[in-house]
Amino acid sequence: MAFNDNPAHVAALNQLISELEADGVKIVDKRGWFWKALHYIVLVVTFGGQRDFLKGYYTTIAHWIGVPEGWDERSAASRFAVLKHEYIHICQARKLGFGNAVVGLPLYGLLYLLVPLPLGLAYFRWRYEREAYVIGIRARLELQPHLRMRLIDSAIKQLTTGRYGWTWPFKRTVRRYFETHVPEATPVTEGDLQLVP
C-alpha cells in the first residue's frame, strides 16, 4: 500500500483485483528473461523512444498483465485505473478469439503492432489504446476527479511519441478525442464504482 493511501481507494482496488482474478486474469511481475528480451525488442523497434518498458509501463499479453517494479508502491487509485485500462486489452483480445484472449492474441497482436503501419500510423493500436485510455482515465477520475487534464495530457504524450511507437502522431486529433470522450467527473461513493466492465 502506498504511503497515505485512501482506504476507500484500497478497498476498490482489492475488489477489482478479486474480480479480475475470478475472471482468469493474472497479474505478474515484469521480471525474468522474457520481459527483458521484450524490453530490448521494444527499445530497438521504437528507435530508443521507449526506454522505460520494464520500470514504467504495464503490458498485457492475452490474460496476463505485466506490472513493473514499484507496482505495490503506486497509489491504489493509480493501480485501479491501470488495471481497468489493461483489462480492456484483455477484452479486446477475447473479442478476436471468440471469448478466449489466448486464441485472440495472434490476430490482436498483428492488428495492434502492424496494421496499417508499425510506426506512425498504427490505426488499430490507436483504436485499442484510446478505448483503454478512456476507461482508465474515467476510472481514475472516479477516485480523483481533479486530475482530468493531467491524465489527458499524459495519454496524448504516450500515444503521439516514441513511447508507443508514434501510434497516432496527430496531437490535436488525439486531444480532441480525449476531451470529447472523457467528461468532467464527480467523485462517487464506494458503492457506485463499476469495477469490471
Each language-model region and where it sits:
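Short hydrophobic helices that act as membrane-entry/anchoring signals
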Residues: 36-47, 100, 104-116
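Catalytic Zn2+-binding segment of zinc metalloproteases
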Residues: 70-72, 86-107
